[in-house]
Amino acid sequence: MGKRLDLSTLTDEEAEHVWAVVQRDFDLRRREEERLQGLKGKIQKESSKRELLSDTAHLNETHCARCLQPYRLLLNSRRQCLECSLFVCKSCSHAHPEEQGWLCDPCHLARVVKIGSLEWYYQHVRARFKRFGSAKVIRSLCGRLQGGGGSEPSLEEGNGDSEQTDEDGDLDTEARDQPLNSKKKKRLLSFRDVDFEEDSDHLVQPCSQTLGLSSVPESAHSLQSLSGEPYSEDTTSLEPEGLEETGARALGCRPSPEVQPCSPLPSGEDAHAELDSPAASCKSAFGTTAMPGTDDVRGKHLPSQYLADVDTSDEDSIQGPRAASQHSKRRARTVPETQILELNKRMSAVEHLLVHLENTVLPPSAQEPTVETHPSADTEEETLRRRLEELTSNISGSSTSSEDETKPDGTFLGGSPKVCTDTGHMETQERNPRSPGNPARPTKSTDEELSEMEDRVAMTASEVQQAESEISDIESRIAALRAAGLTVKPSGKPRRKSGIPIFLPRVTEKLDRIPKTPPADPDDQAKMPKATTAVPSLLRRKYSPSSQGVDSGSFDRKSVYRGSLTQRNPNGRRGTARHIFAKPVMAQQP
């Protein structure tokens, strides 16, 4: 890009946006500079106090070098500073664990100023990036915003940022030395300076109307308040002449400022080097205040005539031919549209950085409350559905068993669509609730379906947790058996089904109808139903009246082993059970 910056093709909204961002940047820099100046004043006071105490070195052995309090053994111990090697008390020192020592308050403040000013960083930026600055942006935008009520920035403000440029810095320093009432010298300076001529070639935008002279005193007073220089009649006489000339030149321009080609933009490195800087250097002084007309400008339609070269136009005989040649050059230039997109991206990045800096520098009461953006209901529903699909796919093995268990209860029959691992099948079932395969199912809202899916997922997760607890219980039993010296070797063959029949409720009802006392006659015993004969002797003994008062502990096993049910005697089983254990669990001799 070089030394040229043309923002004349920006719309009014974009120009206001850029102006507001740059003003926030200046405001934050000024606040940081004021804070650092206060710290510098404290350092100067402490240094003067230290000079007075330097003559009495013996006094520092017994008293603090800062507050002159006497040292005490436990209450107010003596500590030596790492920088100045003076002794200070406990309340006047700061601990530095990384250096394993102490610093007195003046030395600590000096370090804070050195780190907070970032002088080393800005020196590196000035040495590397020399072609862009916030002063150029303000100089390019001040004409448009001045017409809508905004004030023109002072020369000192432009000089604060123009230290990062080569020839632009020389221009700003020379312009600051010149008083505002010497219009002839300013005219000669503007024509002799080549850089300002190149910049002023791009600082004019077509307009639809001529600016009135009523805004001239306001701009002059605002210029006086910002720059601190006296206000004179020569400046007001200079500005109407410039307004008349610019109005005459604007008659042949295009009427609409919104249909304009895009402007050349600064490179990415230069933009971030200047606009992303959080605080100004210690050498640059920002004596400006926030622009008073920026709030009023946003609610109005601003005229788009630039006043950047008003100061350089006070004689029609000299400026007239030059203005015609400049207009012919401006019409011939075309700029790609990609650069305006790059500027928008950079300005958004600068805005994010400025918000972060405002949160750091400004107090919490001055910060505006942030507006939370709530996602739409469709987005929340989509994310919740996606999470439910992930959960159901993770526990697909246990979800099928949970559905089989819930079928006898009748809880989920005829309810919401079945949770499947195939997400596509589930979505088709949800979208077509009245499909031919499921005609009787009532239509339900999305919230009900999601709640049912959540209940089903929770039930499946609880069943998985219960199965895991059972597995851990079995593993603990196996570990206990192994700790007892037993080797458990599971058989590779499938388990043999238990020979003990499982009786349904019908069988228990028939058991209630069985006579209390079994018939002694074998003929009557043969007439009993088959279910009664199928009951083993254990159940018969349980339901018989003779066993009601007998304790269950008096039951006699036929096997010689008396142990727990998990440790069965392999000798009492048939031949297929010998493969389960390699040796008997425990053999007790009778």
UniProtKB/Swiss-Prot annotation:
Domain RabBD: 4-124
CDD domains documented for this protein: FYVE_SlaC2-a
Xref: SUPFAM superfamilies: FYVE/PHD zinc finger
Biased composition (Acidic residues): 154-172
Zinc finger region(s), FYVE-type: 64-107
Residue ranges that the Swiss-Prot or TrEMBL entry lists as coiled coil: 339-485
Tissue: Highly expressed in embryos at day 7; not detectable at day 11. Highly expressed in adult stomach; detected at lower levels in kidney, lung, skin and small intestine. Detected in melanocytes.
Comp. bias (Low complexity): 391-401
Biased composition (Polar residues): 215-238
Entry-linked Pfam families: FYVE_2 (PF02318), Rab_eff_C (PF04698)
UniProt keyword annotations, A-Z: Coiled coil, Metal-binding, Repeat, Zinc, Zinc-finger
Major subcellular site: other
GO cellular component: actin cytoskeleton; cortical actin cytoskeleton; melanosome; microtubule organizing center; stress fiber; unconventional myosin complex
Ranges of compositional bias, category Basic and acidic residues: 424-433
Region feature (Disordered): 147-182, 215-276, 311-335, 361-472, 485-590
Keyword Cell division: no
GO biological process: intracellular protein transport; melanocyte differentiation; melanosome localization; pigmentation; protein targeting
Any one GO MF annotation of this record: myosin binding
Assembly behavior: Binds RAB27A that has been activated by GTP-binding via its N-terminus. Binds MYO5A via its C-terminal coiled coil domain.
Function: Rab effector protein involved in melanosome transport. Serves as link between melanosome-bound RAB27A and the motor protein MYO5A.
Listed name of the protein: Melanophilin
